[in-house]
Amino acid sequence: MSIVVKNNILWVGQRDWEVRDFHGTEYKTLRGSSYNSYLIREEKNVLIDTVDHKFSREFVQNLRREIDLADLDYIVINHAEEDHAGALTELMMQIPDTPIYCTANAIDSINGHHHHPEWNFHVVKTGDTLDIGNGKQLIFVETPMLHWPDSMMTYLTGDAVLFSNDAFGQHYCDEHLFNDEVDQTELYEQCQRYYANILTPFSRLVTPKITEILGFNLPVEMIATSHGVVWRDNPTQIVEKYLEWAADYQEDRITIFYDTMSNNTRMMADAIAQGITEVDPQVAVKIFNVARSDKNDILTNVFRSKGVLVGTSTMNNVMMPKIAGLVEEMTGLRFRNKRASAFGSHGWSGGAVDRLSTRLQDAGFEMSLSLKAKWRPDIDALELCRQHGRDIARQWALSPLPVAEAATTPEPQDCACAAAAAADLGPMMQCSVCQWVYDPAKGEPNQDVQPGTPWSEVPDNFLCPECSLGKDVFDVLATEAK
C-alpha cells in the first residue's frame, strides 16, 4: 500500500516487522525496520531506491499497482546496499533500459551485487541536477562514507524534500510514516541507537557534510529517510541532533560491562558502581553482563557515556571471548572523548586485565588505573573495588565534586626512611614472557612473599602470577638495568 508523502510523492516501500538482525547479526533491530522507497510523479516519473532483496517480488507487484512500469522514466539509487537496491534485478527484468542515476562508486557496488554491467547507468556528482518537469529538479549530493563510499542524498526542489539515504534514519517499524505520529521516546532512542552503532565511526565527516548541504541554502520541509519515519514536523531537529552527536558527544554517565565465569567479576562491578554513586549521586551508572544483554544497547550506552569500566575474568591467560569481541567493535566504532578502566578477577593467572587495558587504549580511550582481584573478592577486596569507584567518580567528574576529608599522611622523616629502605631492596624484576613486574616493595602476598622482600630472597618455587612460569624467566627491569 502506498502512502502520500507530499503532493506527487508516494511512499512505496516495505515494512519489516519481523527482522531482528541487520548487517548479519551485528545489529539487533528490536523494533523491526522499514525499507523506504519513493515514487515521484511529475512530468517525469522517478523511483528513489527500492527495498531489501527478500521483498523483491512483492515490491515490483506493489509498484505495478501505482504505475505502469514502462512509464517509469528514471531510477535513482542513493545507496547500493542490498536493503536499498536489493530489488533492482527483479525490477530491471521488466524495464531493462531504464536509466539509473547514482554515484560512480555505486556502479561498482551495484555490479558487485547484481552482475549487470549492461544496465543504463548515469554517474552523478554533487551539484548535478535532473529536470523532472513541472518546474522541479532533483539535485544530487554525494555523501561518501555516510556510511558507504557510494552514498548520496537527493533533494527535490519545489517540494523541498531531502531524500537523505541512511542519514537521519532509524531501524524502527510503525504503521505510521511520519515522525509526529509515533512514540517520541521510542523514536529518539532508535535514532540514537542507529547513530551510535552505525554512523559513529564517521562522526568527523558528519559535521562538514551537513555544513556543505546547509550551504546550498535550500529550504528543507521534509526529510525522507531510507529507514524508519519521514521527518515532516520540524524536520531539522534530527539534523541538530546529528551535529550534537558528532561533536565528541558525552553525557554525565558511566557504563560498566563485564563477563564472568564464577560471579566474582560481577561482585567487583557492583562494588565499583556503589563507590561511584557514593561520591557522585548525580551520575548515571548502568551495568551490563555482556552474556545477558543486547550488545547494541551496551554500545549505545558507551556512546552516551563519559567513561566505561570493562570487566573480565581470565580464561587461558586472556580475556573472555565476548569481552574481546565487544572491545574489537568499540575499536571499529572509534568512540571519542571517552575514558576507560579495566578490572577483573582471576585465579592462578591474571593476564586478562592487562591485556584488556592495552586493547582499550588501542581503541582510543583515555585510560585510568586498572583493578584486579584474586579468586572471589572478600570484604577487603570489595572495599578496594568501592574505593576504585570513588576514585573514578572524582577523576571522571565533569565538574568538581566536594572534596573528601584528607587522609592522614606519614611524617616527612617516615617517608624518607621508607624511601631509603625501598632503595636497599634491590631492583624490580620483569617476567620475560608476560612482562609482569615484581616490585620488592610490594612483594607478592598471594604467594606469601611479603612487602620488602628483595628478589634474592624470593623462594625458588615462586611462580609469575600472570603466566605461572618460574623465577628463571625473570630479568632485571629494563629501566633499572643500567
Curated annotation (Swiss-Prot):
Residue intervals of the Flavodoxin-like domain: 254-393
UniProt-annotated location(s): Cytoplasm
Pathway field: Nitrogen metabolism; nitric oxide reduction
Residue positions binding Fe cation 2: D83, D166, H227
GO cellular component: cytoplasm
Keyword Lipid metabolism: no
Keywords: Cytoplasm, Electron transport, Flavoprotein, FMN, Iron, Metal-binding, Oxidoreductase, Transport
Function field: Anaerobic nitric oxide reductase; uses NADH to detoxify nitric oxide (NO), protecting several 4Fe-4S NO-sensitive enzymes. Has at least 2 reductase partners, only one of which (NorW, flavorubredoxin reductase) has been identified. NO probably binds to the di-iron center; electrons enter from the NorW at rubredoxin and are transferred sequentially to the FMN center and the di-iron center. Also able to function as an aerobic oxygen reductase.
Name the record gives this protein: Anaerobic nitric oxide reductase flavorubredoxin
Species of the source: Klebsiella pneumoniae subsp. pneumoniae (strain ATCC 700721 / MGH 78578)
